[in-house]
Amino acid sequence: MAFFRCDVMSESLGMATSVLVTMPDTGDLAAAPVVYLLHGLTDNCTGWLRYTQAEHLARTHGAILIVPEVQRSFYTDMACGPKYFTYINQELPTLCRRFFGIQPVPERTYIMGLSMGGYGAMKCAFTAPQQYAGCAGFSSVAEIQAELPQLCRWHEDQAIFPHGIVPPQDDLFDLVEKFRDGTCPMPRLFLACGQQDSLYPANLRLRDTLQAMNWPLTWYEAPGDHNWFFWNDALGRAMKELLEKLGQYRIILSADTASEVR
């Protein structure tokens, strides 16, 4: 695998920002899957490659990894600050095409993240479903309005969202409503959360909402907390599921059993 760490100038952010990219050193890069990996609130773009098997998995699946940096922005166009959502969902693919020749064909493009990054990944997929074949969220901040006071210790939520109120375009439960009439494509989802994670109940509620809409999704849960041990395991499962098995089924997994529902 080739590994690149670069700083690019972003018009959306009004500043230079870091991006990590890994690319297979064999095979046809034009046909390689592209996986965006989004970091969590207390981490940065290095976490995925420092603490998980991400690069090994990318090699196994012949995939390109793109890992951006977003600070503590919740992947949002901030009320008082940079436009991080515009950067991730619109500008970053253009920058990767310009500098690396990466062509993110929707049928082979995936976005995944943990915690805050899981929220960001799903927000991207729900907002622009035509851009992604699949999406994965691990221990995601599913109910962002309820979690903000606990997560934002310096009250940065006031800078991200006006008056600390999450608007519909930034709320996952509001975003999925547009899919109810069946006219929007539903990217395949892989959702995972540890049973001891404080975000587990909210992830169950999101899972139930999506299942009621017959969303093509995989749900994985196992004993585990909000940590890299669980996310490393979940990443391997998600990449195998999404990159190898793009079927027409909704699959529900537990640590011990799996059932497949047409």
Residue map of PLM features:
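Non-catalytic cap/lid and distal C-terminal segments of serine-dependent acyl enzymes
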Residues: M1-R262
